[in-house]
Amino acid sequence: NYYSKREKKLKPILYFAANEKTLIVADSISKYYAININDGKLNWIKNNIAPFNSQVKVFKDKFFVVDFENILRCFSIKDGKEIWNFKTEKSFIKSQQKLSLIINNDRVIFVNTLGDVSSIDIKTGNLIWQTPTQSSDIYENYFSLKNSDLILENNTIYFSNNQNQFFAIDKRNGVIKWIQNLNSNLRPTFADSLVFTITLEGYLVAIDSRNGNIVRMTNIINKIKNYKKENIKPIGFIISQDKIYLSLSNGRLIIIETLTGKPLEIKKIDNEKISRPYVLNNNMYIIKDNAILKLN
């Protein structure tokens, strides 16, 4: 165990990434460390000057993570030493949202708590381009801004937020291709030239990836009895060949027909919030409080 009693009381949030030999952990109390996957032994452990609040990404002999100061940091997997860092503008408050990173070829691309998307040279840490997505005049938006994960398809970055904005950004130069008015901080999914998302109001939306036009919008949450009264919110979704699996804040999982957007089944997983579904080796998993469930 790598935490003292005092640290355990802080209930740190852990962020993971791994390669074939090493598990990398960064947490919300500024610690980061590496564990040998084969024997579980600690390779090294270090402390950052600020807590971490992003995904961790591994690329060759390096890993990348963003801290609460909106600084992207590149570390060595071998010994944990910092190789370079890239600073972006700090926010007035420390957002609790987990920030998203993607790695593509020679670039690491991330969005900070202010909604600025930055593309960084993976070797040098130099800025390639930066695209702000929020007006600097509307400071109150920063306090409540929650972005979805970034996804990358066909040289285009897609993501959305809870400020009624869905973006398509050119990976090569940071130019915004289009913006659609959709309210969602759920990770979108790309399939057959369409981008799928589910809004916080419960609408399944299919978007033409080329121009941002909405192809279809279907209300799926209203199929649940008393969904408005109970303030049920979508948590996350995945798409299979013919079905969409959507987890909800009330512990339910909705199975939706992809072609029509029609809900097929509602499964009770728990009475509390559950995670977005995950797929590993053709099996689906959902995380709930203190447990990981494998679904048939």
Regions found by a protein language model. Give the residues of each.
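Extracytoplasmic beta-rich repeat domains
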Residues: 1-17, 41-60, 82-105, 127-154, ...
